[in-house]
């Protein structure tokens, strides 16, 4: 086991396929558990891009709402700052969220030797007939996290989450 990094910075980007289209969120205020809702379309594929700093960290998959997404190491960024992993998240078979409701979905990403990143996204899944609703709100490129691994190497504490 190597040294435990003081801070881990990671970003998670979602792009709807096949055209790498943007994913949107809306601000719901305090009506639900979280103030931001990510809008996703059922029966669709999303490219997941995870960027991690420091570059010595390794990850094999991310679980999004219980769907295991294998991640493939793509590259280091040209400046050598972060390592980039990609995978495909498929919403085939996911039930649309009922009107007026939101779904909390668990996100987990186990890292080799330093513990598991965990967070919860508030999501609304729309079916094909309401697909235009997925484009109402604000597009985001990435969700960035600043995390601190705990001493037992079991979990990482999320210090900061930013939608950019």
UniProtKB/Swiss-Prot annotation:
GO molecular function, one term: type 1 cannabinoid receptor binding
GO biological process: regulation of trans-synaptic signaling by endocannabinoid, modulating synaptic transmission
GO cellular component: cytoplasm; GABA-ergic synapse; glutamatergic synapse; plasma membrane; presynapse
Pfam families found in the cross-reference section: CNRIP1
Transmembrane segments: none
Signal peptide: none
Known function: Suppresses cannabinoid receptor CNR1-mediated tonic inhibition of voltage-gated calcium channels.
Annotated family: Belongs to the CNRIP family.
Subunit structure: Interacts with the cannabinoid receptor CNR1 (via C-terminus). Does not interact with cannabinoid receptor CNR2.
Record's protein name: CB1 cannabinoid receptor-interacting protein 1
